[in-house]
Amino acid sequence: MSVSPLSPRMRTTLRAALAAWIVLLAFTLLAPSSAGPDWVIAHLAQALQGLGLPDVLTHPRRVENMLNVVAFVPLSLLGSLLWPRPSWRDWTAVGFVASFLVEVVQAVALDARSATHADVVANTLGTLIGALLGHLVWRILGPRASEGGADLPDRHASAEELEPPR
């Protein structure tokens, strides 16, 4: 079996960052009121307008959609750095299911929130982007890790190649 090129300290840091991001997302996405997210959207839209960006990019609905994409990037990025064996397709599927479940909870249990299919699409896109970024990081770290004697797990290795040396 391959040795992870990530130090134990780095793995602990990534786990803590992932846990913190999950808590922040749960607090934001499952809050009974949309006042917090609406405040962030309004202020970010205003800040983007202040930068001189065109109205088509600073409309609150466009900003909300962008934030829905960005919110899910860290989940699959951090997850794929911690657990590189699942492919970007696996992480994207996990993101789709998680986003779908969030929207179901918003539709069924949170009267002040609105569930939309556009949010599921945006969150899934964010998960895909994060997973691809994680894959890219592993591709970059791969040759460096191999030089140090540590190898990245091969997603397509045969069972014999994955067995430890005897």
Segments from the language model and where they lie:
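Gly/Ser/Thr-rich beta-alpha loop segments that engage phosphate groups in nucleotides
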Residues: 128
